[in-house]
Structure formats: C-alpha cells, structure tokens
C-alpha cells in the first residue's frame, strides 16, 4: 500500500475520531499512560540500542541527549498525559452564539483540524507528546521521527496505537512512517493531510515548505536572545542566563546570543564569564567583550547561529533600541528576554521585539507548552497565522459555523421583507 493510500485511510478515520466523546478520548489517554508504564523495560532496552548505534555513528552530543528516553522522560510524558486528561474537552465548545433574526441562530463551535502530519527530530518523548495532544484534540496524526530513534519510535508507536484501539478509538486514527524516503511521499498527500508540522533544522523546515502544497506550521531555528539592560539586577541576570544556556542545552528555546548594555558590561561580564567557565560554556565575544574577559573571538556568523551546544555569543550594545534591532535582524522570532528593573524599558522591548515570546526577568526556557499549562506541545510556531508560540491543544483546533433556521431564505432579506437584528446570546 502506498503512503497516499495509507494517508487516505487516516483521512477516512478523521470524522470518526472527531465525533468521539471527550470521555472516550480521556480513557484512551489513560490507557496510553498505563501501557507505557507496563512496557517501560522493553522501551528502555530498545532506546538503549538506538543510543549505542548513535554513539557508534558519531552522532553529536546534543542529539544524543534528545534521543535518550529514560525514567525521567517517561515520568514527564506520563505527567503530561495526566495533565491533558484533567483539562476540559476542547471540542464542541461554543465560541460565538448570535441570533441573526427570530428563529435564525448562528453558533461557532470548535472542531479538530483533521489529519496532522508531524515530522520531528530524534526525540522519542516528542512522539508521545504529539500523539497525546492529537488524541485529546480529536485529530488523526501521521508521525515521522528522526532516523536515529527508529527503534524507539516504533515500540512507542506500537504501544500507543494498541492502547488507543483497545480503548475504542477508530482504526487508522494514527499512522507511523519509518523510512526517510516516505517524507517526500507524504508531502504530496494534500488531499488527505490538512496540516504539516515539521520540526528540525532551518534547512529542513524550508525544504518542507517549498516542496508541498499542504499548509505548514512551525519554526526553523531557535536563535533566542537575552538582553541585559543598564537597569538590570545582576543577581537576577546571571542565574537567568545560566539557566537559559545550560538547563537543557539542546532545546530550541535555549539562549544563543547575549546582548549587554554598555553601562553594565564591566560589572556583569567578568562575573558571568567565571560562572560560564565553571559550567564549561564557551563564551564567544566581540572586541568589546574581549577587552573585559578572555574569550573566543566572535564572528559575524555567530549572530545567526543556533548552537544547541555549550556555546554563548555575546555583544555589547549602546541602548535597548540597538538590542531590539539586533534581535529583529538576527533572531528567529522564537523567544527573547530582557533583564531589567525598568518597567517602561521592558514594555518597550516587549512591544518592539517581533517574536512569539517576549519575556522580562526570566529564562527563555519557559517557552514550552507544558510550562505554559497547555499540558504538552506539538511544537513551537513562529508563524503569525493560526497559532504562535508553543502549540498546545488550542493550536490544534479549528472551528465550524452551525446555523439553525426555520425555513429562512436569503431572498426575504434581499427584498427587504425581513431584517437582521444580530443579537449576541449568552
């Protein structure tokens, strides 16, 4: 069976899944959580095989960190599933109720997008999170994970699919692609797939966007910035920078570039450099930074690089506006933070920086669906259409209009025999 034919079966399952009750979908999620726990030893063994092969292949350390699926990550994904179960059913929610005329009533109601194709990096925990979000939101899903995690993804998918089927969700509500070559086939399935969410490098995401007619939602690079203003509290700034750089270095919301106001640089940079050195972070600085501390010289390329590694580039700026201009020019519109005690400066920064997330006095690592209280996320979108920032349940929903009448016809209004009165209902 071709990928197009398999995707067609998923499309046929879409209205069946959309019509299920929230109670049934929650039961399916609980079944998934139980199945993952029951099969954890086998899952860990298979993941160990992927890890060993990746190490033999010389895979970079950040990728290895994402690839690992251990007790901690299992606990996190199961907690995320339980959080989703506690959330109200996102479907069939009335967002607008309006009486257009007597006996003619309009409702806008939430519904699933339909079939979502997600192409993601070698992160087994992402497969679980994405699957759970799609189950909760009533969306069928087609999954393609990174090749380094092939065995881990297969056992996780098989475990999840068996659990949801046993719980009563429709056949073909989920599909897993395993071969890299199948990605290009998926890109041609515009009659079956309603939305693609690619996660990966900038080059990969751009490739997906330019080779499909399916709508694409997502982000490419995660070039996040922290700007330390002249009115910053250094006691806050250093822990924030350290957390944003080292808490999970291979994440897309990790800070890559530090901008420091000239008036605070002499006090901040030497202290920060010492702490970064202790954490084995390589500091790359401009000439002005090099004049304050011993560090690796930065190049223009560093302004546009997502390291996903223990590297931080740093630059001194004259003003908050120079910082804003730098971020808007070199950033990826993902997440950027200002450290300052000046409320007006912070608000100016947050208004002018064109990113999905703009923060004051906190780490960029908060850009995450779970930390936003979304339960989990399917990815982070830097698009300004439909969904922006961490994409949780709400970002996986569309809506439909339901109009209830009693023999109403448009010609009565066109000829003036009747008039609309447009009354919003509670």
Residue ranges of predicted features:
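A structural signal for short, well-ordered beta-strand elements
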Residues: 18-19, 230, 316, 339
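N-terminal Rossmann-like NAD(P)+-binding subdomain of aldehyde/semialdehyde dehydrogenases
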Residues: 1-106, 133
């Amino acid at each position: 069976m071709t990928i197009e034919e398999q995707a067609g079966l998923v499309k046929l399952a879409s209205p069946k899944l959309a019509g299920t009750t929230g109670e049934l979908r929650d039961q399916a999620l609980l079944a998934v959580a139980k199945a993952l726990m029951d099969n954890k030893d086998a899952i860990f063994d298979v993941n160990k095989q992927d890890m060993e092969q990746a190490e033999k292949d010389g895979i970079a350390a950040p990728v290895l960190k994402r690839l690992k699926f251990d007790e901690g990550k299992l606990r996190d994904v199961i907690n995320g599933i339980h959080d989703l179960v506690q959330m109200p059913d996102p479907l069939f929610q009335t967002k607008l109720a309006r009486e257009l005329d007597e006996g003619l009533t309009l409702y806008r109601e939430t519904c699933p997008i339909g079939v979502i194709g997600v192409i993601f990096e070698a992160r087994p925990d992402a497969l679980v999170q994405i699957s759970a979000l799609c189950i909760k939101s009533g969306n069928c899903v087609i999954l393609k994970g990174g090749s380094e995690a092939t065995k881990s993804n297969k056992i996780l998918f098989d475990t999840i699919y068996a659990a949801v089927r046993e719980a009563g969700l429709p056949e073909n509500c989920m599909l897993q692609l395993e071969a890299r070559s199948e990605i290009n086939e998926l890109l041609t399935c515009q009659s079956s797939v309603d939305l693609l969410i690619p996660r990966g490098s900038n080059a990969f995401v751009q490739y997906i966007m330019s080779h499909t007619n399916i709508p694409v939602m997502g982000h490419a690079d995660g070039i996040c910035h922290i700007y330390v203003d002249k009115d910053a509290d250094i006691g806050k700034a250093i822990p924030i920078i350290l957390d944003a750089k080292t808490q999970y270095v291979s994440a897309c919301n990790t800070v890559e570039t530090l901008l420091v106001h000239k008036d605070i640089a002499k006090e901040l940079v030497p202290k920060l450099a010492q702490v970064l050195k202790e954490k084995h972070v390589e500091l790359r600085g401009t000439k002005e930074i090099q004049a304050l501390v011993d560090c690796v010289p930065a190049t223009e390329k560093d302004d546009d690089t997502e390291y996903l590694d223990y590297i931080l580039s740093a630059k001194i700026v004259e003003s908050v506006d120079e910082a804003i201009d730098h971020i808007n020019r070199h950033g990826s519109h993902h997440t950027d933070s200002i450290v300052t005690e000046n409320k007006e400066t912070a608000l100016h920064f947050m208004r002018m920086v064109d990113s999905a997330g703009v923060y004051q006095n906190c780490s960029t690592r908060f850009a995450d669906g779970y930390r936003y209280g979304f339960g989990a996320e399917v990815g982070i979108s830097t698009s300004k259409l439909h969904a922006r920032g961490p994409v949780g349940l709400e970002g996986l929903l569309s809506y439909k209009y339901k109009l209830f009448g009693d023999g109403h016809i448009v010609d009565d209004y066109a000829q003036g025999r009747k008039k609309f009165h447009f009354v919003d209902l509670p």
